[in-house]
Amino acid sequence: MLTVLITISACGPKKEYLSPLEIEKEKEKVIEVIKEYQVAYDEKNFGKVVETLADDVIFFGTDSSEVIKTFADFKKAIEKQWQEYDKIIYGEMRDVSIQMDDQGTLASIIFGTNADFIVGTDTSNYYLRIARVLKKSNEKWLIVSGIVGIVRPDEHYGAIQEPETP
């Protein structure tokens, strides 16, 4: 009986682990998908945005009540945001950290970037911290979840936290 179990387990599907070089190549592909998403978002092209997303997604917005779990909610939220500005210009991705499983099927990326929001002739610059989780499906990386935070300037945060002295 033990021989049969050993034979069955030896013949079963084996997990394929990627080499460190293969992992690095997959991480580059993850960054490409993130950039594709940002370009599509900037161009206000919902069809291209959807091409970067998995079938099931969840997003947390900067508003505490903004939890998006369906494409219908996602489209509604994006279209509302797209009405609030004319263009976004993203800066380079900074402090990029990507964690990936050994098989190259699940990845988490977190990074910072400057973003110029342009409304008419006015430009507002923000520093964003963005986190995304991606999964590989049919040899393509797709975003399954995400969250964006707007970084507050230190002096503003300090003013909120420091109590007044009597």
Where are these regions (language model features)?
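Bacterial N-terminal signal peptides
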Residues: M1-I8
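Short, low-complexity N-terminal intrinsically disordered segments enriched in polar/charged residues
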Residues: C11-E51, Q161-T165
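Short beta-strand edge/turn micro-motifs at domain boundaries
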Residues: G12-K15, Y127-Y157
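Second-shell loop/turn segments in exported
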Residues: P20-I23, Q38-V39, T62-V67, G120
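Hydrophobic pocket/interface hotspot
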Residues: Y37, V49-V50, V57, F74, ...
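A mature extracytoplasmic/lumenal domain signature
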Residues: L53, D63, D102, F111-T113, ...
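A short gly/proline-enriched turn/hairpin at secondary-structure junctions
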Residues: I58-K69, W82-D86
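Surface-exposed, charged secondary-structure patches
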Residues: K75-G120
